[in-house]
Amino acid sequence: MKNKKEVYGFRKSKVAKTLCGAVLGTALIAFADKAVFADEVTETTSTSTVEVATTGNPATNLPEAQGEMSQVAKESQAKAGSKESALPVEVSSADLDKAVADAKSAGVKVVQDETKDKGTATTATDNAQKQDEIKSDYAKQAEEIKTTTEAYKKEVAAHQAETDKINAENKAADDKYQKDLKSHQEEVEKINTANATAKAEYEAKLAQYQKDLATVKKANEDSQQDYQNKLSAYQTELARVQKANAEAKEAYEKAVKENTAKNEALKVENEAIKQRNETAKATYEAAMKQYEADLAAIKKANEDNDADYQAKLAAYQTELARVQKANAEAKEAYDKAVKENTAKNTAIQAENEAIKQRNETAKATYDAAVKKYEADLAAVKQANATNEADYQAKLAAYQTELARVQKANADAKATYEKAVEDNKAKNAAIKAENEEIKQRNAVAKTDYEAKLAKYEADLAKYKKEFAAYTAALAEAESKKKQDGYLSEPRSQSLNFKSEPNAIRTIDSSVHQYGQQELDALVKSWGISPTNPDRKKSRAYSYFNAINSNNTYAKLVLEKDKPVDVTYTGLKNSSFNGKKISKVVYTYTLKETGFNDGTKMTMFASSDPTVTAWYNDYFTSTNINVKVKFYDEEGQLMNLTGGLVNFSSLNRGNGSGAIDKDAIESVRNFNGRYIPISGSSIKIHENNSAYADSSNAEKSLGARWNTSEWDTTSSPNNWYGAIVGEITQSEISFNMASSKSGNIWFAFNSNINAIGVPTKPVAPTAPTQPMYETEKPLEPAPVAPSYENEPTPPVKTPDQPEPSKPEEPTYETEKPLEPAPVAPSYENEPTPPVKTPDQPEPSKPEEPNYETEKPLEPAPVAPSYENEPTPPVKIPDQPEPSKPEEPTYDPLPTPPLAPTPKQLPTPPVVPTVHFHYSSLLAQPQINKEIKNEDGVDIDRTLVAKQSIVKFELKTEALTAGRPKTTSFVLVDPLPTGYKFDLDATKAASTGFDTTYDEASHTVTFKATDETLATYNADLTKPVETLHPTVVGRVLNDGATYTNNFTLTVNDAYGIKSNVVRVTTPGKPNDPDNPNNNYIKPTKVNKNKEGLNIDGKEVLAGSTNYYELTWDLDQYKGDKSSKEAIQNGFYYVDDYPEEALDVRPDLVKVADEKGNQVSGVSVQQYDSLEAAPKKVQDLLKKANITVKGAFQLFSADNPEEFYKQYVATGTSLVITDPMTVKSEFGKTGGKYENKAYQIDFGNGYATEVVVNNVPKITPKKDVTVSLDPTSENLDGQTVQLYQTFNYRLIGGLIPQNHSEELEDYSFVDDYDQAGDQYTGNYKTFSSLNLTMKDGSVIKAGTDLTSQTTAETDATNGIVTVRFKEDFLQKISLDSPFQAETYLQMRRIAIGTFENTYVNTVNKVAYASNTVRTTTPIPRTPDKPTPIPTPKPKDPDKPETPKEPKVPSPKVEDPSAPIPVSVGKELTTLPKTGTNDATYMPYLGLAALVGFLGLGLAKRKED
């Protein structure tokens, strides 16, 4: 098999990164690839954003989906277990060879039979056994050949002696025979003469005979002609008669045929009639049979139906009895619970009364102690005040003297301190300056010494390097004609090898394409994967491989329009030691054979040393490239003398599917070429360089195949290269290609030629610094002498105040037991319905049968003519007699030659056969996959980010093997496996380990020491070392399959078994049925368990968040202990601004509802408030919490893993949270999101969103029940006027989450100015939809659905909706109501009023209304309204519907005015049948109608 490099969509990268050709793919590792294990690749770092596909899993960290398996891995695994060739095993045959040689020398016929194939030994034991068999066989063959050879030698000697004796006797007999033979020859000549005369006479007679014979033949021919004439006439008449007879016969036969046809048709028709009759009869009989069967089945079905109905009826009656009994028992239990509850609450009330008495006694004791404390405290304060006055007088005198002394001392001190500060300032400045001088001197000295040391080290290094450089140049000169050396030795002064962090800029006038945009443009050119033209579809695959790499700038070059690509921020490049900071490439398309020749795609790399890709779409392309370098000052640099490498210039290495004769070349180089001795690249006209013929295949004349020279590590990579010497500031050359598809060229200073030294740059010696001199300090000032300060007075201590008594802790009364919940009764079962009987089928009718038709009679036969008599032929004349040839005299009998005596039969040459035996060995290999603990994880699951190790094992090499010259293992790693090169090297001693990033392939080559171990004793088996690949699996829901290839001595290759491991998160995984997306869920539910995601949630409601910890896909997981110790967590990032957590209600259960232990929950106010361990945990999982959060954690990760993770048991966390009451006053949306963290990997739930409605109750003042009437807020209400407080409740929006349990109006009115009349009305503010589907229209009177509580003493009215009514309202319906409280103004002044609307126990305050009542001009005597009799507050009163006459209905838009101070005699109806509001007409009418007594006025 030839080494073939397939061009397939990804260009190999070279460490040299030099200008190179169009081969795109990494060479596939195959058995025949011998020592070529991977194409040359370099790792590059890109800062560009790359779009990646994700798994669909809600992962927070590592969300990328596993990429497609590399082509190398795909083909390797497709051939898993396959073997190519084997290693020969040699067994000595020396004795056999000597026996064969001796036999040949003795004349024995030696036949070498076909070599006996002993097969392939796959183990050392098998090999040893087969070698023993071969050795035994060789010994046996040698012995048999020796025996045969010796026997044959003896037989040959005896035969030779007998042969010599017989030869002498035979010679004497032969001499006598020669004499007799001469006499015989003389007699023969005499007889021959007589016979010649007799022959002449015979020939004359023969001539006469032939003449007579001709005459007779002529007569016979004339007779024959006459006969033929008569025969012709006969045949004519015969033909006429035969024709007439034939026509008569034909007419007869036609009549017979027609008769037969008619009769056959009649027979067919009769047969059809017979068949139809039979079919009709059979159909009838079958129908009758079916009828009878259907009739029986229907009867049977009707019987079964009746039996089934009876059975269901019996079961219904049984179930009905059970349900009725169960409901009766439930009612009995409920009644018992109510009785017990009443008894408990009676006891609690008695105990609460005792507590109240104890609290009152404790309060009385406390009040007495407080009174005594206050008297004692007053006496102490008086004594302390006298003491304080005396102390203050003494203190004043002291402070006056102290002030004088302190001022004098302060003045002196200030003068001195100023002098000191001035002195300090001056000296500080001098010291600072001196310190700076000292520092500058020290820095200068240190800098100088460092530079001097560096200079000396650099100088020594330079001298050493210069000596090596000189020697290298001399060596290059001496070897310039040898393969791989420059034909003109040069040194390299340019360092331009790698700039991964360069900043690439392209002028904004040049359009940079996006991936999809460029893809669409190229497809519009006909380059498409669906194009039936294979050349164009193949060209698209090449283009797409480059276009999918987003680190390149995607450009379209237009003919003769230059495009500049500038790179700045260069860090690693220099020329003759001078730094290069910028490089500018100018690309100009000169020509192309593609389409109209005006455009071509190009891709500019982010690294200027990697440079660019361009396309030719299997046509031709020529691009001019100009290069300019700039120094740190921005000046153009002249790099004359620098060397650049033009390498990997392939020819004949194109796509076999299109045209292999692809050519890559450099043209119009404005520098000077320096050929490499032995290179295939030659200089041509126009200063171009390329190969004259194929340099890809030996069979086409190349010195090596491509795979033997076109790799980074190949010592022959100079074979496809030439070196360019720069001769001017602007470098210019053309990159040209033909039929290459994609071409990558890299412009840099890596040189493929051997022995090109880098010229060292001599260091510059540093200049010794000039040191500064330090300045002297100023002298210090003299300190002053100070006056002593006076002694301060001593204050007598105050008397301590008496201890204040502590207020006692009062006992809290116990709450009453809640009433028992009424039972929910089972519905009685539905009685069964009997299925109607099936009707009987219709009976079939017997058919009418057809009659058959008679046949036609046969026709009469014709009479024929007789045929004529044929003519008689006359016999021929007889021919004359032929003369007889004479009898000649016989020749005499010659003498008998003597019969020589038979020589003795020579001994039969024996034939000996021998054969050799062939034996091959195939060392077997095995791939194992393990976790970090060394546990086999093949065909199992492990967590994402787990360390996974691949062990590449080879069994012992067998005895008798050839010398091992190479032992190479190649492992194309699975996509998404993060390879750890350092750890792999550490785990793979005995091997040189290399990694090809482009193909994601690791190669292990046995070191020389390892090979020496293998070859120490070839006669014995030897155990092999095995390398281990170490890395991590990075993707969710990924399957990692892997095998490797072993190649020994470039001859034997074997591909291992395929191992597989899967990470959780893969739906429809055929290998792991439990595997699916790792998808934690979060659902908000109410207390009934209904999903309330997205619904309106009232303040004070409890959200029962249900968090699913999704673990089922981990079933069978075999993650390592290290992965398990990363822990298992669940994070709830709740909105603390809206919710309060309820840790007392948190529950954790498994899928079956069993409570789970070993999971703790911790709440943190913020990420910053959490421990660093928690912060690191969330950071690693890439989880960002917004504020407060809860963290659920497994206390013991290992136990948690065993019990739940490895068993695939998902958990359900119920995490209740209550909506803060204050949030209802502002309203708004709140969001909640949670995260699951397994093995350190995070997965997010969906965001749960709810909204809290803003409850905004409103209060108006009206004189009627008309909602459109004027609001008197801020206006005047007359004394004794009757009016209404309109209490408009908050709006509960539709689609709310919780049933309404409480909706109340609490009006704490000012009883000093207002008097509640005891009358109120409550109406629906909007349409209400009930659970049963009925609708209550807006404006409907709902007073009967409320209860009212009145506290006249404190001026409080509470109107509350009945709970059973509220719970009938559908959750999908909005709700709002308003209540009118009828009031009477009973005092003069301004009065303010606010009411509270409570919704599910949360209070919301309304606006405040203000009304003013002036002093009336002519006040009437008021008629007091009796205060309603206080009711039991525990038994709120339900207002009764008043019975009123039916007065004329007034227009509600024009309310009837109320007379001030005068009572009305009637109260109009407050509503019509359609629930339209009606105005109240006045207090007196209301009093008269309701029959209310006078109430005691509240006092101010």
Curated annotation (Swiss-Prot):
Residues 1-38 form the signal peptide. There is a cross-link at K927-N1042, K1082-N1232, K1259-N1393 (Isoaspartyl lysine isopeptide (Lys-Asn)). The modification Pentaglycyl murein peptidoglycan amidated threonine is found at T1470. It is found in: Secreted, Cell wall. Ca(2+) 4 binds at D1308, Y1309, Q1311, N1354, G1355. Ag I/II A repeats lie at residues 146-220, 221-302, 303-384, 385-466. It comes from the Bacteria. InterPro entries: Adh_isopep-form_adh_dom, AgI/II_N, Antigen_C, Cross-wall-target_lipo_motif, Glucan-bd_C/Surface_Ag-I/II_V, LPXTG_anchor, SA_I/II_PAC_V_sf, Surface_Ag_I_II_A_rpt. Interacts with P.gingivalis fimbrial protein Mfa1. Residues 771-887 are annotated as: 3 X approximate tandem repeats, PR1. Residues 1471-1500 form a propeptide. Its main location: secreted. The lineage of its organism: Bacteria, Bacillati, Bacillota, Bacilli, Lactobacillales. Ca(2+) 2 binds at Y1077, D1110, D1112, Q1113. Residues 801-816, 840-855, 1429-1451 have a biased composition (Basic and acidic residues). Disulfide bonds: none annotated. It is a peptidoglycan-anchor. Residues 764-906, 1410-1473 are annotated as: Disordered. This is Agglutinin receptor.
